[in-house]
């Protein structure tokens, strides 16, 4: 069984077990995979539309009015700060040099452009992940709190989270786990429309399921599901 070792911001560790089976269950049983990851894909990778905002709100239970995005001038044919972000950049796979000298700064500019009044780190990264699924880590509050990421400033929060997800994914054992998970999803044919979650998204989903199960074990649907499947708790 493939495990993911998580080192949090305070130095403590956690282990997420049975990652292959849990991600397969996520892709087949969690509506957000279809409604967000699959249906929310953009036609133009540099053009955020109401479709992405609606997909986020519907699937991830976010409340971010389309009008707010329109008022901030974000729903335009080509957002320059987004255009500067290569669609092939991969948060986990890129070298430290490329991340530090080229990508991190451009990602910060994109976050500064998007995260305005009434668009925080959570909703901002959820929409931007659809535009750059290999690069943008989702700053969901459950995951942010689980890892212990500071939340005072939206841009800083999103960038720190990206660094934490990158560190988790670049661990040698975790990299092996992520490769096994992707291979399992492809082999098991559990994904839709050839949308196999990126390494970044796999980490996000596993962290979210783990954190949600720890936070509300008596209410978390995944906690019951794992028991039924004979897997380790979230």
Task: Outline where the language-model segments fall.
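Short hydrophobic alpha-helical segments that form membrane-spanning helices or hydrophobic packing faces
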Residues: 123-130
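An N-terminal alpha-helical hairpin/helix-loop-helix interaction module that forms a charged
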Residues: 1-115, 133-234
């Amino acid at each position: 069984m493939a495990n993911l070792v998580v080192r949090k911001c305070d130095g403590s560790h956690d282990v997420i077990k049975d990652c292959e089976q849990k991600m397969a269950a996520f892709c087949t049983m969690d509506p957000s995979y279809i409604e967000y990851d699959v249906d929310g894909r953009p036609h133009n990778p540099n053009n955020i539309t109401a479709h992405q905002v609606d997909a986020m709100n519907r699937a991830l239970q976010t409340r971010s009015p389309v009008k707010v995005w329109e008022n901030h001038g974000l729903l335009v044919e080509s957002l320059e700060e987004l255009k500067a972000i290569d669609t092939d950049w991969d948060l986990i796979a890129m070298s430290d040099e490329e991340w530090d000298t080229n990508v991190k700064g451009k990602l910060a500019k994109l976050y500064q452009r998007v995260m305005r009044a009434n668009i925080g780190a959570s909703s901002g990264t959820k929409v931007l992940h659809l535009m750059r699924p290999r690069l943008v880590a989702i700053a969901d509050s459950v995951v942010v709190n689980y890892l212990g990421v500071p939340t005072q400033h939206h841009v800083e929060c999103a960038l720190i989270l990206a660094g934490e997800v990158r560190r988790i994914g670049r661990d040698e054992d975790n990299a092996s786990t992520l490769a096994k998970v992707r291979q399992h999803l492809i082999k098991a044919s559990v994904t839709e429309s050839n949308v196999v979650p990126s390494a970044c998204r796999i980490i996000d989903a596993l962290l979210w399921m783990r954190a949600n199960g720890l936070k509300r074990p008596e209410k978390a649907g995944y906690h019951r599901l794992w028991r039924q499947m004979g897997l380790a708790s979230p």
